[in-house]
């Protein structure tokens, strides 16, 4: 919660923090932590004080039913649908941890998660995960 208050103060000043996904193991060794995990953990911490929407930007329009068809965006996905898509081989690779982080964030109090193109961040496209 201490981190939440510190970031909350930054947010209240209308400053946008930029965070690198670098962490350490407590033994002096630097680690390159998954950026989605850092974003998710930050969103979870802030959700204790604010209404938070977590946006994951990447090179596709959203979570796709067919990775070869950029227009096959799944507009909204539930945990059960996600698990079925994984079992069916529709969702695989790097999208699995991105969605796992998304559901963890929702379960921890984040209001909504959006997965979309960076250029589409201000419209209603992409894939949405809600409470």
Regions found by a protein language model. Name each.
Residues 1-11:
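Single conserved hydrophobic/aromatic residue that forms the stacking wall/gate
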Residues 9-14, 22-23:
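Glycine/proline-rich, flexible active-site/cofactor-binding loop segments
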Residues 47-64, 112-118:
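Glycine-rich phosphate/pyrophosphate-binding loops
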Residues 18-45, 73-122:
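Polyanion-binding loop/helix "lid" in catalytic or ligand-binding cores
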Residues 121-131:
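Short, basic/aromatic-enriched C-terminal tail that caps enzymatic domains
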Residues 29-30, 65-68, 125-126:
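Short, well-ordered secondary-structure micro-motifs
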Residues 16-20, 55-57:
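Structural motif
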Residues 12, 44-48:
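Short, conserved, surface-exposed binding loops centered on an aromatic residue
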């Amino acid at each position: 919660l201490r981190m939440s208050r510190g970031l909350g103060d930054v947010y209240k000043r209308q400053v946008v923090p930029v965070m690198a996904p670098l962490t350490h193991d407590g033994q002096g060794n630097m680690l390159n932590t998954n950026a989605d995990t850092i974003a998710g953990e930050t969103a979870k911490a802030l959700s204790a004080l604010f209404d938070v929407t977590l946006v994951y930007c990447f090179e596709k329009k959203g979570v796709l039913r067919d990775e070869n068809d950029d227009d096959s965006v799944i507009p909204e996905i539930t945990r059960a649908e996600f698990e079925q898509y994984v079992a069916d081989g529709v969702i695989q690779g790097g999208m699995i941890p991105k969605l796992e982080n998304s559901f963890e964030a929702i379960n921890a109090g984040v209001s909504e998660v959006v997965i979309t193109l960076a250029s589409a961040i201000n419209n209603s496209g992409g894939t949405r995960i809600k409470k």
